[in-house]
Every structure is written in structure tokens, then in C-alpha cells.
């Protein structure tokens, strides 16, 4: 899980979703998981 000031899709399978007001990126590739800090 990467914590970043700005989250972006890295590959076509990445999805940006909002959970409890926190922007997250979920993907098949675990390296692409991100959360907005």
C-alpha cells in the first residue's frame, strides 16, 4: 500500500474508489494499491 498526496491509475485494471471519504486505488497487481494520505 502506497500512501500518496495524489493517487492515479497506474494500469488499465486500476480502479479509483472512495471509501469513508478516503480515495483508494484497487488493482489486481498488489503493487498498485494506493491510498490518499
Swiss-Prot record:
Write out the GO MF terms. structural constituent of ribosome
Q: Tell me a GO cellular component.
A: cytoplasm
Task: State the UniProt keywords alphabetically.
Answer: Ribonucleoprotein, Ribosomal protein
Q: Report if keyword Repeat is assigned.
A: no
Instruction: Enumerate the InterPro entries for this protein.
Output: Ribosomal_bL36, Ribosomal_bL36_sp
Q: Which NCBIfam families match?
A: rpmJ_bact (TIGR01022)
Official protein name in the record: Large ribosomal subunit protein bL36
Source organism per entry reads: Nitratidesulfovibrio vulgaris (strain ATCC 29579 / DSM 644 / CCUG 34227 / NCIMB 8303 / VKM B-1760 / Hildenborough) (Desulfovibrio vulgaris)
Amino acid at each position: 500500500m502506497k500512501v500518496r498526496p495524489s493517487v492515479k491509475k497506474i494500469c488499465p485494471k486500476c480502479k479509483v474508489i472512495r471509501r469513508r471519504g478516503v480515495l483508494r486505488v484497487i488493482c489486481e497487481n498488489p503493487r498498485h494499491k494506493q491510498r490518499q494520505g
